[in-house]
C-alpha cells in the first residue's frame, strides 16, 4: 500500500534530513491541499507527523490535525509526541484512524500494551526508528530521534509480539532506517525483507530513502505491507498515481 506522508512544524509542510531539526526544508504548500491531492490520486491512507509535538509534546498541533482530518475522506494515521492516553483518545475522537507511538513504546511498553488492549490493534501503530550500527544491530531511537533508546528493534518487538493470553497482539509497525530518511538514497529493502519474514503477523510499513518508482517496487517485493513516501512526492520525483500503479492498493 502507498502511504503518502507530510511532516508539519508550526503549521508548515517540512522535511528534515535524517531527522535533524537543524536540517529542515520548508515547502510553500497548504497541508490540506497537499493531502487532498494525494487523496484524489487514489491514496487510501495518509500519514501525518507532528514534528513540533515530537520535539515538545506541549506544543502539539492538534487544532491543525483536527482540521486536516475533517477535510479529508480517507484514513489518517498520526504520529509525533504522543506521550499520554489523553492524547491518544483526543486523536481518535477527532477521527484519526491510527495513532503512531514512538518513544513511549521504548520507555513505557506496558502502558502502550494497555492501549492496544483498550483501543484495539488497528488503532495503534508502533514507530520504530532505527540506527543500524557497525555490528548490524538495529538500535531504536527516541524523542524525535534526539537520543538513542538503548533497545534493539528485535527486543522491543518481542515485548509486543509474544503476548500473554490477555494481551492484544501488535498488528501495525512502521520502521524507518534513520540513515536513509530524507536522503532519497533508496530504501533499506534488506531490513524490510528480514522483518516481514521474522514477524509475518505484523503489517510492516517501510519508511526512509524512497526516491524512485524502482524503490517502490523493491519495497513491495520485500513483503512490507506498505510504504511511507514523503520527500519524493513533495519534490515531484513521481506522483501518488504512478506509485499506486507500481503497488496497487489492497
Swiss-Prot record:
Catalytic activity: 1-(5-phospho-beta-D-ribosyl)-5-[(5-phospho-beta-D-ribosylamino)methylideneamino]imidazole-4-carboxamide = 5-[(5-phospho-1-deoxy-D-ribulos-1-ylimino)methylamino]-1-(5-phospho-beta-D-ribosyl)imidazole-4-carboxamide
Pathway(s) it belongs to: Amino-acid biosynthesis; L-histidine biosynthesis; L-histidine from 5-phospho-alpha-D-ribose 1-diphosphate: step 4/9
Top-level lineage group: Bacteria
Residues annotated as catalytic: 7, 129
GO cellular component terms given for this protein: cytoplasm
GO biological process assignments: L-histidine biosynthetic process; L-tryptophan biosynthetic process
Annotated CDD domains: HisA (cd04732)
Key word Zinc-finger present: no
Gene Ontology molecular functions: 1-(5-phosphoribosyl)-5-[(5-phosphoribosylamino)methylideneamino]imidazole-4-carboxamide isomerase activity
SUPFAM superfamilies: Ribulose-phoshate binding barrel (SSF51366)
Pfam families (UniProt xref): His_biosynth
Broadest EC class assigned to this enzyme: isomerase
Keywords assigned: Amino-acid biosynthesis, Cytoplasm, Histidine biosynthesis, Isomerase
Compartment(s) of residence: Cytoplasm
EC number of this enzyme: 5.3.1.16
HAMAP family noted in UniProt: HisA
Record family assignment: Belongs to the HisA/HisF family.
Protein name: 1-(5-phosphoribosyl)-5-[(5-phosphoribosylamino)methylideneamino] imidazole-4-carboxamide isomerase
Record organism: Shewanella denitrificans (strain OS217 / ATCC BAA-1090 / DSM 15013)
Gene responsible for this protein: hisA
Amino acid at each position: 500500500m502507498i502511504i503518502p506522508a507530510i511532516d508539519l512544524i508550526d503549521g508548515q509542510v517540512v522535511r528534515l534530513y535524517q531527522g535533524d531539526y537543524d536540517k529542515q526544508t520548508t515547502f510553500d504548500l497548504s497541508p490540506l491541499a497537499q493531502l487532498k491531492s494525494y487523496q484524489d490520486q487514489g491514496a487510501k491512507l495518509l500519514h501525518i507527523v507532528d514534528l513540533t509535538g515530537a520535539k515538545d509534546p506541549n506544543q502539539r498541533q492538534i487544532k491543525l490535525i483536527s482540521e486536516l482530518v475533517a477535510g479529508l475522506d480517507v484514513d489518517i494515521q498520526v504520529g509525533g509526541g504522543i506521550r499520554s492516553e489523553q492524547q491518544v483518545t483526543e486523536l481518535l475522537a477527532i477521527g484519526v484512524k491510527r495513532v503512531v507511538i514512538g518513544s513511549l513504546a521504548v520507555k513505557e511498553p506496558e502502558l502502550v500494551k494497555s492501549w492496544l488492549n483498550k483501543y484495539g490493534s488497528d488503532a495503534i501503530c508502533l514507530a520504530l526508528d532505527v540506527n543500524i550500527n557497525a555490528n548490524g544491530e538495529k538500535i531504536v531511537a527516541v524523542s524525535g530521534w534526539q537520543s538513542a533508546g538503548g533497545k534493539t528493534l528485535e527486543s522491543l518487538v518481542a515485548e509486543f509480539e509474544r503476548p500473554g493470553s490477555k494481551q492484544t497482539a501488535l498488528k501495525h509497525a512502521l520502521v524507518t532506517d534513520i540513515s536513509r530518511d530524507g536522503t532519497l538514497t533508496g530504501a533499506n529493502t534488506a531490513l524490510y525483507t528480514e522483518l516481514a519474514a521474522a514477524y509475518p503477523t505484523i503489517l510492516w510499513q517501510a519508511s526512509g530513502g524512497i526516491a524512485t518508482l524502482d524503490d517502490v517496487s523493491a519495497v513491495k517485493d520485500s513483503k512490507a505491507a506498505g510504504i511511507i513516501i514523503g520527500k519524493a512526492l513533495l519534490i515531484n520525483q513521481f506522483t501518488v498515481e504512478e506509485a499506486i500503479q507500481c503497488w496497487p492498493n489492497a
